[in-house]
């Protein structure tokens, strides 16, 4: 009986230790991209780029996030990846759920990076974002952030 109690105590210790030290599947290493900034260059191109609170970079977007930063990502996914491939477009609702996750994985694979469905520094540097000229929002030119536009 004492052996059974000792074994049960050991098992409970291991289980509790595992539950306490387990990390979430999508641990965030950067703050959430809560907003976006409309960046312009000298040629007159404007790009909506996700940013963290108070303009913090790098930032990340994960499943379950929502807001203006997710909207900017959805615009990029629609204009630079889904529309050119003839795929169904996302609603730009600011909700990072299954459809945004799948679209991001598609874009990441097209960009040649790890398709994990998480938007962080590598995705920000590798994915293309829509760049518009003038006062119209017609067909965009897609380019990577920090790179010269055509």
Residue ranges and their predicted role:
Residues 98-105:
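Periplasmic OmpA-like peptidoglycan-binding domain that tethers envelope proteins to the cell wall
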Residues 70-74, 101, 124:
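Extracytoplasmic/secreted envelope proteins and their assembly/folding machinery
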Residues 75-82, 105-113, 128-132:
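Sec-exported extracytoplasmic/periplasmic mature domains
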Residues 24-94, 138-150:
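Acidic, Ser/Thr/Pro/Gly-enriched interdomain connector segments
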Residues 1-27:
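Secretory targeting and sorting signals
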């Amino acid at each position: 009986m004492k052996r059974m109690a000792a074994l049960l105590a050991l098992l409970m210790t291991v289980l509790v230790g595992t539950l306490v030290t387990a990390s979430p599947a999508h641990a965030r290493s950067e703050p959430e991209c809560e907003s976006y900034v409309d960046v312009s260059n000298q040629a007159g191109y404007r790009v909506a780029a996700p940013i963290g609170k108070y303009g913090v970079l790098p930032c990340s977007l994960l499943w379950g996030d929502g807001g203006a930063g997710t909207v900017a990502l959805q615009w990029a996914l629609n204009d630079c990846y889904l529309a050119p491939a003839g795929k169904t477009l996302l609603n730009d609702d600011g909700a990072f759920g299954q459809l945004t996750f799948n679209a991001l994985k598609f874009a990441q694979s097209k960009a040649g990076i790890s398709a994990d469905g998480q938007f962080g520094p590598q995705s920000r540097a590798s994915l293309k974002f829509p760049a518009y000229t003038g006062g119209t929002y017609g067909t965009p030119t897609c380019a990577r952030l920090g790179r010269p536009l055509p």
